[in-house]
């Protein structure tokens, strides 16, 4: 009894153990079956059963996931569902909580799509090195699409608004069904071979994977990759991806975006042209201004060399020479004045001030240049007389009369008395015509 008591569980405990066992054993499963008992309450969640001929399982797909379904779930529809097994503990219901669901036919198509994409990628069909850039200016555009679909209306509307001058050819084609891929491929090859177009756009609106299957055709993908003309693919909505998108030189998420990629906005072009015109005008004005300045310089040079300008040139040269001569004379006078001032300073150191005062007065009184020159000559003669007077009392004149100036040979000091000398002193005697060196033998005073 004790052993049995330890194994007794409550319903909630048992359901919890069962839930953990289910979720641990089946983390994620794929199920292909028919829909039944489809309900969608106000909460937005989706509840139904997946069934076959012998069994069924309760399923739930909550609103965040069910909102993205690309089809309307209905009774009897065969689907491929992915989810995790769990158990609703409150009722003990075993169920499958789904995060993805598609129509059963799409499951096979998607597997075929992935296999073909991997094979073409391995062959290098989708390599980025093979892709061509779009031309800067598209003049002629070929659009391969359904002539009655929403895609062609969107493309033409955007092109007309942004760049109405673009030449557009609509190449009508089926975009859905068994023969659509072959027709699109044929139109692409003919448009590429014509050499008429700058870009070829392949486009259609959104749809299911089966609706878009023509754009997953291997021959079409290879034709796009082999085209010499740049190809833009805009198939379905932004979440739809086809092999034509991988093979194309440029992939656009929607037809409208493709049209915007292909042509500039005419308003932006007008603004760019106006800015270019403004820069060109500025450049022209600058260039013209430089040319006019150069022409003015040449005209001045020509006028300077013309016969009419010769007298004026000579007159200017004469005036320049006169100014230079006056400046030169002024410089000479200033130098003479400086010499007189230096001579005055020398005379002041040897004679009374009265000898120079009259000279200074005469210099200050001499304003005209001619009078100044005559006065300078007179003063020069007077200075020569003063110099002769000074020379008469100069020590050199005394030496010339037979005397000598005796200095010590060691330091050059003048010997003024015999008492300053001792036996052996070496002396230098400066005579009128030279000097002699003597050695003191004896000295006598008195």
UniProtKB/Swiss-Prot annotation:
One Pfam family it belongs to: Exonuc_VII_L
BP-aspect Gene Ontology terms: DNA catabolic process
InterPro entries for the chain: Exonuc_VII_L, Exonuc_VII_lsu_C, OB-fold_nuc-bd_dom
Primary location group: cytoplasm
Top-level EC class: hydrolase
Keyword ATP-binding: no
Documented EC number(s): 3.1.11.6
Disulphide bond pairs: none
Localization per record: Cytoplasm
Keywords of the record: Cytoplasm, Exonuclease, Hydrolase, Nuclease
Reactions listed under catalytic activity: Exonucleolytic cleavage in either 5'- to 3'- or 3'- to 5'-direction to yield nucleoside 5'-phosphates
GO cellular component: cytoplasm; exodeoxyribonuclease VII complex
The keyword Nuclease is assigned to this record: yes
CDD domains given in the database record: ExoVII_LU_OBF
Entry's Gene Ontology molecular function annotations: exodeoxyribonuclease VII activity; nucleic acid binding
Subunit structure: Heterooligomer composed of large and small subunits.
Family membership noted in the UniProt record: Belongs to the XseA family.
Function: Bidirectionally degrades single-stranded DNA into large acid-insoluble oligonucleotides, which are then degraded further into small acid-soluble oligonucleotides.
The protein, known as: Exodeoxyribonuclease 7 large subunit
Organism, as annotated: Xanthomonas campestris pv. campestris (strain B100)
Gene: xseA
């Amino acid at each position: 009894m004790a052993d049995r008591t330890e194994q007794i569980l409550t319903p909630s405990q048992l359901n919890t153990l069962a839930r953990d066992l289910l979720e641990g054993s089946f983390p994620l499963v794929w199920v292909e079956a028919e829909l039944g008992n489809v309900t969608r309450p106000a909460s937005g969640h989706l509840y139904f059963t997946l069934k076959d001929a012998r069994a069924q399982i309760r399923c739930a797909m909550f609103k965040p996931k069910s909102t993205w379904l690309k089809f309307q779930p209905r009774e009897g529809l065969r689907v491929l569902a992915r989810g995790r097994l769990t158990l609703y503990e409150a009722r003990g219901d075993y169920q499958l909580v789904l995060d993805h669901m598609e129509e059963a036919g799409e499951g096979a198509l998607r597997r075929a799509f992935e296999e073909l994409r991997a094979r073409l990628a391995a062959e290098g069909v989708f390599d980025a090195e093979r892709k061509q850039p779009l031309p800067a200016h598209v003049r002629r555009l070929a659009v391969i699409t359904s002539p009655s679909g929403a895609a062609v209306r969107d493309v033409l509307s955007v092109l007309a608004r942004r760049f109405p001058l673009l030449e557009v050819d609509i190449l009508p084609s089926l975009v859905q069904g068994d023969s659509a891929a072959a027709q699109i491929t044929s139109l692409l090859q003919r448009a590429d071979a014509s050499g008429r177009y700058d870009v070829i756009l392949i486009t259609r609106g959104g749809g299911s994977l089966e609706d878009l299957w023509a754009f997953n055709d291997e021959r079409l993908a290879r034709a796009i990759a082999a085209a010499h003309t740049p190809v833009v693919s805009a198939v379905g909505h932004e979440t739809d991806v086809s092999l034509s998108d991988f093979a194309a030189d440029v992939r656009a998420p929607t037809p409208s975006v493709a049209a915007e990629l292909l042509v500039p906005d005419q308003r932006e072009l007008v603004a760019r042209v106006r800015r270019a015109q403004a820069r060109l005008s500025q450049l022209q004005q600058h260039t013209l201004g430089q040319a006019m300045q150069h022409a003015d310089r040449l005209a001045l040079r020509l006028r300077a060399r013309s016969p009419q300008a010769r007298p004026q040139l000579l007159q200017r040269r004469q005036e320049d020479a006169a100014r230079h001569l006056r400046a030169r004379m002024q410089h000479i006078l200033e130098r003479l004045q400086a010499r007189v001032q230096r001579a005055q300073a020398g005379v002041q150191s040897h004679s009374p001030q009265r000898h120079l005062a009259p000279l200074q007065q005469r210099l200050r009184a001499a304003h005209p240049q001619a009078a100044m020159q005559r006065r300078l000559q007179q003063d020069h003669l007077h200075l020569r007389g003063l110099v002769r007077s000074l020379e008469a009392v100069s020590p050199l004149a005394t030496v010339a009369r037979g005397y000598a100036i005796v200095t010590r040979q060691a330091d050059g000091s003048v010997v003024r008395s015999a008492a300053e000398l001792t036996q052996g002193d070496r002396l230098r005697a400066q005579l009128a015509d030279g000097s002699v060196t003597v050695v003191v033998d004896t000295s006598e005073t008195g």
